[in-house]
Amino acid sequence: MINLEQFISQYVTERDSSLFAKDIQNNSVALTKAIKDKSMLVIGGAGSIGSSFIKACLQFHPKALVVVDVNENGLAELTRDLRSTKGMYVPDDYVPYPINYAQPVFEKMFRARGGFDIVANFSAHKHVRSEKDIYSVYCSCVYS
């Protein structure tokens, strides 16, 4: 079976560690104080940026992690990834919700949980304008 992390390091990024590794290490005391035993809500957590944020934060042991995303398959992938990664800390209170944060059920969940210590919002449109229509970006950047 292929080791995905090793493959990415060797063939994609061509580096052994994250560009943020040194900063995270240098600020580990402050990050631990800010995250350890805190409740976290990550909106848009199934996407690439949100899931990377979650993985970076989990090493500092939050007491609760609630992930909200409209992409139910992405939430399932994130959950499998977190639970199958050797050495990955996942709090007992880990709940993925496939909901839109603009729906009334989001507010109901938020109030029922009594709020959160940390809220991070990485929700975004699936495709940005430049991916769909490169010429619109060209026109607005060159002719504006």
What are these regions (language model features)?
Residues 39-60:
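N-terminal Rossmann NAD(P)H-binding glycine-rich loop of SDR-like oxidoreductase domains
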Residues 69-74:
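Helix N-cap at the beta1-alpha1 junction of Rossmann-like dinucleotide-binding domains, i.e.
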Residues 78-79:
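Conserved SAM-binding loop
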Residues 94:
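Short, conserved active-site loop motifs that form the nucleotide-linked donor/cofactor pocket
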Residues 1-39:
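Non-catalytic terminal and boundary segments that flank Rossmann-like NAD(P)-dependent oxidoreductase
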Residues 56-67, 83, 89-90, 99-138:
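NAD(P)H-binding glycine-rich loop region in Rossmannoid oxidoreductase-like domains
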